[in-house]
Amino acid sequence: MSHAPSEETHIRVLIADDDRAFLSSLQVLIDRQPELAVIGTALDGLEAIELADDLDPDAVVIDLHMPLLDGVSAAARLRRDHPNLCLIALTGDDAPALHRAVREAGADEVLLKSELVEGLLVRLAAARARS
């Protein structure tokens, strides 16, 4: 699903998470920041890749455990196809091997969902330097 960004937006963000309630909350959090706007949301890894190709976001926030294509595989494809993208992985899973795998796949950051409020906005603001 795509969303129209405001004209004042500096960082265009795509969010991918299969938990609709979490996705909605995250969208509200990001859209409340004047320098950020959610331009699309995806419920699985394949949809995230398709939307990234269509919408050309500055940043993607992606869950690691999703249907159709997991976040690690989606991150690898996103990094390959969009090398300048700010790619932030979100997960509730604190397994070091999973975090290592998604970093190796191309994620710039891995955040636990429990760290969301403190860490995500800081990292998305850093995307400004990349765009």
Q: Predicted regions span which residues?
A:
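Acidic catalytic/metal-coordinating carboxylates
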Residues: 44-47, 69-73
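Active-site beta3 strand of CheY-like receiver
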Residues: 55-61
